[in-house]
Regions:
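Adenine nucleotide-associated cytosolic modules
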Residues: 1-176
Length: 176
């Protein structure tokens, strides 16, 4: 929705900002056209109330998880592969991504979105759930998707919620 063929060659951060400002000219959008690193992520995230991660690679998911834990920020992680996706929300004191997947996989062993493809509507489903989680966190209404992983399968139109208790031996959040 944010990016069209007319945006080919443009930085995603610019095309997304431009479209969002056209939707609501009263919003303030801070953009960062740089690589997210273990050094820059905590500095950027500390300025925000809630972080939404929706990248297409595990390296970034672990980086966002680790940086948010380091600065005590709540966040939503979302991922898509082929016809489905998954999402979870973390607030301090609840399970983090490393509670479920303690060790980051070797990128060469995991197919990426470019090689296996994604169903655009599945992206919309997971993105809408992440947007809902963000609104629920900010407004304090409803029950967040903490200590759980929501798995959506668009090929069967099923949703499963997997219990994700905080791991007392988590290498990252068990100390927080």
């Amino acid at each position: 929705i944010l990016h069209t063929t007319a945006d080919l060659g443009r930085a995603k951060v610019e095309s997304a900002r431009d479209k969002l400002v056209r939707l609501n000219p009263n919003i303030k959008i801070d953009t960062y056209q740089e690589f997210l690193t273990p050094e820059t992520a905590p500095e950027i995230f500390k300025n925000y109330d809630f972080v939404v991660e929706c990248s297409d690679n595990f390296q970034t998911k672990y980086l966002v998880n680790d940086a948010c834990i380091a600065v005590g920020k709540p966040f939503s992680l979302g991922g898509i592969r082929m016809l489905g996706g998954q999402t979870m929300t973390h607030v301090p004191g609840t399970a983090c991504y490393r509670c479920l997947f303690p060790i980051e996989p070797d990128p060469s062993t995991v197919p990426n979105s470019s090689s296996v493809g994604v169903l655009g509507s599945a992206v919309g489903i997971i993105g809408s759930i992440q947007a809902t989680e963000t609104i629920k966190y900010i407004t304090g209404i409803g029950t967040l998707l903490t200590d759980r992983l929501l798995v959506a399968d668009a090929s069967t139109m099923t949703f499963n919620t997997i219990s994700l208790p905080r791991n007392p031996k988590c290498p990252l959040c068990s100390e927080k």
